[in-house]
Amino acid sequence: MLEITLLGTGSPIPDPDRAGPSTLVRAGAQAFLVDCGRGVLQRAAAVGVGAAGLSAVLLTHLHGDVLITSWVTNFAADPAPLPIIGPPGTAEVVEATLKAFGHDIGYRIAHHADLTTPPPIEVHEYTAGPAWDRDGVTIRVAPTDHRPVTPTIGFRIESDGASVVLAGDTVPCDSLDQLAAGADALVHTVIRKDIVTQIPQQRVKDICDYHSSVQEAAATANRAGVGTLVMTHYVPAIGPGQEEQWRALAATEFSGRIEVGNDLHRVEVHPRR
């Protein structure tokens, strides 16, 4: 069984009720933080997960809204290196983040006798193929389409016969269909293009170019034959009592289980027999 927790269901648009985009996937004793938008460390703390409890951080792309909480560490005296898996460019972003916190790191090393080095991090960059295989949990990567943001990737996590695919920001594409084929669950970002296109600001309308609508995400789930569609990264934010509107739109393209939730919404994923 895999457990999905929507830590942050928001978008780059500030929302007092939604943290930035991030999803926690638990696979047995392992836990993976997929993207890490603003406020996600607080959301992770709410479900009892700290930096020391993470097996790895997985980044689908390098847009700022999924990187705001990229400073993930703990106060252990000798922590194991934290793996960060992302597309090419991830190492540069991590290096820049460590540099930005250089003064803070120096202050803490000077203050605490048991801290002698910056936090250990292992960066692994992928565009496709296997990315993880430990203790019965595997992760596979495939390219997605969020151009002009490139490269971008999605992740397929498998454990004990259950599988979940995390698409990140993307428009429909063959590589995502292939990655998600037969998965038990697909976590997909969604926007309401019918609403966004009515906003009289071109920069806002532009986001329709490289995100999937609710119906497009649902059609991807249908083509891939997944069991459950989990929607997240809602643009605009879902208001109270509006969840059924979004679910109904998805249901026009996908007849399986559809999950729409606020931050901290949990979904259990079991292998389909």
UniProtKB/Swiss-Prot annotation:
Is Nuclease found in the keyword set?
yes
Q: Which residues make up the binding site for Zn(2+) 2?
A: 169, 233
The chemistry this enzyme catalyses reads:
Endonucleolytic cleavage of RNA, removing extra 3' nucleotides from tRNA precursor, generating 3' termini of tRNAs. A 3'-hydroxy group is left at the tRNA terminus and a 5'-phosphoryl group is left at the trailer molecule
Cofactor(s) named in the record: Zn(2+)
Enzyme's top EC category? hydrolase
* Free-text remark on how the cofactor is bound: Binds 2 Zn(2+) ions.
Report whether Zinc shows up as a keyword of the record: yes
State which Enzyme Commission number(s) the record gives: 3.1.26.11
Q: Which InterPro entries match?
A: AtsA-like_MBL-fold, Metallo-B-lactamas, RibonucZ/Hydroxyglut_hydro, RNase_Z/BN
Record SUPFAM superfamilies: Metallo-hydrolase/oxidoreductase (SSF56281)
- List the Gene3D superfamilies hit by this protein, alphabetically: Ribonuclease Z/Hydroxyacylglutathione hydrolase-like
- Transmembrane regions listed in the UniProt entry: none
Top-level taxon of origin = Bacteria
Give binding positions for Zn(2+) 1. 61, 63, 146, 169
Keywords attached to this Swiss-Prot or TrEMBL record, sorted alphabetically, are: Endonuclease, Hydrolase, Metal-binding, Nuclease, tRNA processing, Zinc
Could you tell me one molecular function GO term of this UniProt entry? Answer: 3'-tRNA processing endoribonuclease activity
Q: What interactions and quaternary structure are annotated?
A: Homodimer.
Cited HAMAP family: RNase_Z_BN (MF_01818)
What PANTHER family does UniProt report for this protein, alphabetically?
ZINC PHOSPHODIESTERASE ELAC PROTEIN 1 (PTHR46018:SF2)
Q: Which purpose does this protein serve, as stated in its record?
A: Zinc phosphodiesterase, which displays some tRNA 3'-processing endonuclease activity. Probably involved in tRNA maturation, by removing a 3'-trailer from precursor tRNA.
Question: Which NCBIfam families does the entry link to?
Answer: PRK00055.2-4
Instruction: Give the similarity note.
Output: Belongs to the RNase Z family.
Protein's recorded name: Ribonuclease Z
Q: Which organism is it from?
A: Mycobacterium tuberculosis (strain ATCC 25177 / H37Ra)
List the gene name: rnz
